[in-house]
Amino acid sequence: MLSVILLAIALAMDAFSISITKGFTQKKIQKQEILWYGIFFGGFQCFMPIIGYVCGTTIRSFISTYAPWIAFILLLCIGLNMIRESITSSDEKVADIFSFKEVTLLAIATSIDAFAVGVTFAILNISLVIPCAIIGIITFLFSIVGIFIGKKLGDYFGDKFQILGGVILILLGFKILLGF
């Protein structure tokens, strides 16, 4: 259960970072807009592992022998990508308006990692219900909290939290590989 919570926190870091930035840049963000960010980010993070699981289930029988290595490589790549993105994208500008199109695109972009985690769940034959619920709830909460933090503190912490998320994914990859 601790691994699922740590994974959920790691996956939520992209949405959290973006939420901090949105809180900082959208000076007049409304409460319902804050709720929409949480719903979209949490919803996509909840359902993308399911889509990844369905895709991963079709290939499970072919690669079950290599599952720990595949999980490790997927999580390592995702974690390294999160760290790389946090280092290279710190100068992005974010608009001061709310749009469903933008929040949808942001939710998709921040949940691609969750898709890969779903593939890993299929390879390792891990049940989806509880992990997906935890991932969605934690992302929902982190998104809302991130906007409030962004409103108070600005976007200073955004990239650092994304680095932490990448490190957690890499550590989970090693945990799976080593069989702990």
Curated annotation (Swiss-Prot):
GO cellular component: plasma membrane
Record-linked Pfam families: Mntp
GO MF, one example: manganese ion transmembrane transporter activity
InterPro entries associated with the record: Mntp/YtaF, Put_MntP
Keywords assigned: Cell membrane, Ion transport, Manganese, Membrane, Transmembrane, Transmembrane helix, Transport
Keyword set includes Transmembrane helix: yes
PANTHER family with a match to the protein in the record: MANGANESE EFFLUX PUMP MNTP-RELATED
Family assignment from sequence similarity: Belongs to the MntP (TC 9.B.29) family.
Protein name: Putative manganese efflux pump MntP
High-level lineage: Archaea, Methanobacteriati, Methanobacteriota, Methanomada group, Methanobacteria
Gene behind this protein: mntP
